[in-house]
């Protein structure tokens, strides 16, 4: 296992807490005689940092490890940019839930130190590729670590669509939308819509209808290598949107097709050696502790 030498830092803008944590992290890494590289947008609000700066794309090409300081939203954005470069990513939580950024600020030096000493776990998380097509023309493409969501946008009207899996017709449906989520995204929007929690190691995709106008409609878990096709009804009067991780958005027209499949590149997500997925679920989702008051 090669030691990490070139460490990139990405952070969420607009937060003094994030900047304070980045300053601590920078000092800690420099004290360990490591080469530290700042994302250029963060460098602009850290005057006098004296470090090399670059874009996320370049960071993925030159770094051995990238540390993301922020919440899960910050990690989602970084993941889409860095997965293609296979650079491992570590998260320090400065958000709310922190399913992906699981190091607390108060344990920064201890946990990051363990990772630098080779004591860590690496998980591979797959991303989804979403393509919006109008006939043979591509109208938009996006990647998602959590989910791809078809929704009505600013309209309050229901969407009518057909769903196909691996070329086979599944159903037509009227609903407020449809969530297509990875195991990583199963604890995000899909969970709020009544979908199941899927362990990150599962090679599966969950399809969750949003308020379907059909009592028998339920979430479906399919093989992770499935190709999903959503055909927006040509008779609709609204223009629904497709959102990737809630951050990238594309507008569909009636009759458009949304194709969703797994991307070949995977995010390499690093956790501290004592990472416990079920403990995180228990803590973040408020599950009950052991009977008798144990941990």
From Swiss-Prot:
One of its GO terms (cellular component) is cytoplasm. It comes from the Bacteria. Gene3D superfamilies: Probable inorganic polyphosphate/atp-NAD kinase, domain 1, Probable inorganic polyphosphate/atp-NAD kinase, domain 2. Keywords: ATP-binding, Cytoplasm, Kinase, NAD, NADP, Nucleotide-binding, Transferase. The active site is at 72 (proton acceptor). Belongs to the NAD kinase family. This is NAD kinase. The lineage of its organism: Bacteria, Pseudomonadati, Pseudomonadota, Gammaproteobacteria, Pseudomonadales. The gene is nadK.
